[in-house]
Amino acid sequence: MLLYICLVNLLLPLSVGAASGAALGVIAKVGVDAALQQIDDVWKGKTVRYWKCAVENRSSKTLYALGTTQESGSMTTVFADIPPKSTGVFVWEKSRGAAKGAVGVVHYKYGNKVLNIMASIPYDWNLYKAWANVHLSDHKESFSDLYKGKNGAKYPTRAGNWGEVDGTKFFLTEKSHAEFKVIFSG
């Protein structure tokens, strides 16, 4: 108990960075020893979370790379346009040394619309689940709207299940090194 109180006093002042609320959640859920090991792994940069995504463009138009919305982590590969009848691949990785997952949105321009692709791979699988969503809209969608199913976006699909929305089928595996398959038909 004394160790827990010391950790709380140590971690609470950290408003940004390696620990904060996520570490406290780990302590409460998995116990002090496991929490200390996870915190140590984060500080040493050993914890890896990412999603690699293959976007298959089955439409007759090019998907133009429009940018990303970073929630946690960033794209670690080249973000390129995807011609018709082609597949583009990229990797989104969590930030090193942060107790956060690999979370964000990738945007492609499709004609006068925007294809928004969201994935959320949690840092702590004991507390959170992986989710994915896709939405074709008139503008770039925020992570929050896609994650919460707001402003015209459908509620996200939990990893391990096929989702289908706006002419797009998608599947996200439920693991730390997730694979995300997106099939866009336009």
From Swiss-Prot:
Region N-terminal region, as annotated, extends over 29-48
* Single GO cellular component term: other organism cell membrane
Tissue expression: Expressed female germline during oogenesis.
UniProt keyword list = Cytolysis, Membrane, Nematocyst, Secreted, Signal, Target cell membrane, Target membrane, Toxin, Transmembrane
| Compartment(s) | Nematocyst; Secreted; Target cell membrane
Q: Which GO terms describe its biological process?
A: cytolysis in another organism; monoatomic cation transport; pore complex assembly
Q: Which Pfam families match?
A: Anemone_cytotox (PF06369)
Show the GO MF annotations: channel activity; toxin activity
Q: Where is this motif: Cell attachment site, crucial for protein stability?
A: 158-160
Q: What is the effect of changing residue 94 to A?
A: Important decrease in cytolytic and loss in hemolytic activity
The signal peptide here is 1-18
Q: Which family does it belong to?
A: Belongs to the actinoporin family. HALT subfamily.
What is the protein's known function?
Answer: Pore-forming protein that forms hydrophilic pores and causes cytolysis. Compared to equinatoxin-2 (AC P61914), it reveals lower cytolysis activity (5-12-fold difference, tested on erythrocytes), a larger pore size (probably 2-3 nm) and different affinity to membrane lipids (100-fold lower affinity to sphingomyelin). Binds to sulfatides (SFT) as well as to the two sphingolipids, lysophosphatidic acid (LPA) and sphingosine-1-phosphate (S1P). It seems to bind more strongly to LPA than to S1P and SFT.
Q: What's in the domain note?
A: Composed of a long N-terminal alpha-helix and a core region rich in beta-sheet structures. Before the pore formation, the alpha-helix binds the lipid membrane, partitions into the lipid-water interface and stabilizes the monomeric molecule on the membrane. Finally, it traverses the bilayer, thus forming the transmembrane pore.
Could you describe the subunit structure of this protein?
A: Octamer or nonamer in membranes. Monomer in the soluble state. In vitro, interacts with folate receptor alpha (of target organism).
The identity of this protein, by name, is Hydra actinoporin-like toxin 1
Species the sequence originates in: Hydra vulgaris
